[in-house]
Structures are given as structure tokens and as C-alpha cells.
């Protein structure tokens, strides 16, 4: 019997260090985690992915977390937990009035965040948290639960290593992943061929092959982008 898919969390914080620490901590505790750097980035991720819960920093440059919360509440019922350096009662009330489900002042213990997330998820009706989780890549759609790529009702065949790469990139959509990290992740994925997954050059070859299947023009990648000097990033619609 297959186990249920882990809850998918969206972490939105403009502080790269905090964002990375929270992402690693929550992944270690059994969640699927996608990270956004600001409200605009979060909107792009929300347009192509389904989340069980959003952890949202209030104090961000540009559109702040309260404004984003108010807008999201007009479109979706996904639970929102706000993080902020301002812990006054008035600020907490403002956050809850905006539509947040909970409010956690900084600094906080990661364990408390974990407990609050689990408490919110226990309260949320199944109908709210359930649903298709997919990425849109132009005419293509990637199902996160099934790990399947399709165009309309036609499946797009992926090799074991291509499928492993898609799983890795989809779990970190919008985030740069370095070659070393990709090699390590592929090495842990038993479905990927050990020979295909080994080495920087082999990863580049597999990226090129995957682009041929997901890009309108593989020579000018729109979705699977190269971030010079850093690695690769999957940028869904």
C-alpha cells in the first residue's frame, strides 16, 4: 500500500538564510517544501502549484505579507501562517484580520513553527488540502504526486534519470540547484541509472535531453534555465 503524499508547503521570506534554514528543517520533518523570495515570486509559484499551507513573512520589500494574504483570501482557502519581527498584539490582530490562520513572531524556535504547522493542518478539512498538485510548463503539465509529465491527455515518456531530475526540480521549483547537489540527489534516487547520473558532464547531458522534451525551443530554454555559475532552475508558468 502506497503512503499518502507529504503536505506541500510554500515558504515565502526575502531573507535567503532564513528561507534556506526553514526549507531544510521542514524537509527533514517530512514535508515537501517550495520556497519563494517575495510576493511576486510567490504568486508565480501559486499559479502553477497547489499547496497545503503557506508560511509567509510579513516584512518584505515590495508587496508585504499582509497585502498578499488579503489578496489570496479572495481566491483560495489555503491556510496561511504569518511570520513577523513585530510581535505586538495590534500587529497580530491585523494579520488575523487579513485572513491568516496563525501568527508567529520572530525570533522563534523551529520546533514551535513545526507544531503550529501540524496543528493548522489537523484543523483544515480534507477537501481544502486535497487536490491535484501540478506544474504548468506551457502546454505540458507535471503531476507532482504521480511524477508524470503529460501534454493534454497524452503522456510524455521520460527515462528513469529524466524522471528523477523532474522530481528534484519540481520539489524546488523557482530555486537554483547546483550541479553538485543534483549529482548527490540523483545518487540517492534509486530509479536513476548510476552510470547516467555520475559526474558534471553527465548531468549536463541529461539536462539537454530533458529540455528537448519540455522546451518549445531547447536552444533558448524558458522553463529549465541555466543560472550561470550556480546551476539550474525550473521556472514553471
UniProtKB/Swiss-Prot annotation:
PROSITE patterns attached here?
A: OMPR_PHOB, RESPONSE_REGULATORY
Q: Name one GO cellular component term.
A: cytosol
User: Which residue ranges does the Swiss-Prot or TrEMBL entry mark as DNA-binding?
Assistant: 77-95, 132-236
Q: Which UniProt keywords apply?
A: Activator, DNA-binding, Phosphoprotein, Transcription, Transcription regulation, Two-component regulatory system
List residues modified as 4-aspartylphosphate.
57
User: Is Transport found in the keyword set?
Assistant: no
- SMART domains per the record? REC, Trans_reg_C
Q: Which Pfam families match?
A: Response_reg, Trans_reg_C
Occurrences of domain Response regulatory (ranges): 8-121
Q: Name one GO molecular function term.
A: transcription cis-regulatory region binding
GO BP annotations listed: regulation of DNA-templated transcription
Q: What does this protein do?
A: Necessary for photosynthetic and respiratory growth. Probable promoter-specific protein mediating the interaction between DNA and RNA polymerase.
Protein name according to UniProt: Protein PetR
Its source organism is Rhodobacter capsulatus (strain ATCC BAA-309 / NBRC 16581 / SB1003)
Amino acid at each position: 500500500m502506497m503512503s499518502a503524499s507529504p503536505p506541500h508547503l510554500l515558504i515565502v521570506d526575502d531573507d535567503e538564510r532564513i528561507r534556506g534554514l526553514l526549507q531544510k528543517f521542514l524537509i527533514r520533518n517530512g514535508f515537501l517544501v517550495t520556497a519563494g523570495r517575495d510576493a511576486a515570486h510567490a504568486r508565480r509559484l501559486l499559479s502553477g502549484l497547489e499547496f497545503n499551507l503557506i508560511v509567509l513573512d510579513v516584512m518584505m520589500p515590495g508587496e508585504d505579507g499582509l497585502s498578499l494574504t488579503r489578496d489570496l483570501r479572495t481566491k483560495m482557502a489555503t491556510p496561511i501562517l504569518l511570520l513577523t519581527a513585530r510581535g505586538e498584539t495590534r500587529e497580530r490582530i491585523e494579520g488575523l484580520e487579513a485572513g491568516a490562520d496563525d501568527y508567529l513572531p520572530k525570533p522563534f524556535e523551529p520546533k514551535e513553527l513545526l507544531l503550529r504547522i501540524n496543528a493548522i493542518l489537523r484543523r483544515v478539512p480534507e477537501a481544502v488540502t486535497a487536490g491535484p498538485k501540478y506544474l504548468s510548463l506551457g502546454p505540458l503539465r507535471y503531476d507532482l504526486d504521480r511524477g508524470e509529465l503529460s501534454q493534454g491527455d497524452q503522456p510524455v515518456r521520460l527515462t528513469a534519470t529524466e524522471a528523477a531530475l523532474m522530481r528534484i526540480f519540481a520539489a524546488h521549483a523557482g530555486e537554483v540547484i547546483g550541479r553538485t547537489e543534483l549529482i548527490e540527489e540523483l545518487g540517492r534516487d534509486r530509479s536513476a541509472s548510476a552510470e547516467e547520473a555520475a559526474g558534471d558532464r553527465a548531468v549536463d547531458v541529461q539536462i539537454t535531453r530533458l529540455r528537448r522534451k519540455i522546451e518549445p525551443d531547447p536552444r533558448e530554454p524558458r522553463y529549465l534555465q541555466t543560472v550561470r555559475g550556480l546551476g539550474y532552475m525550473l521556472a514553471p508558468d
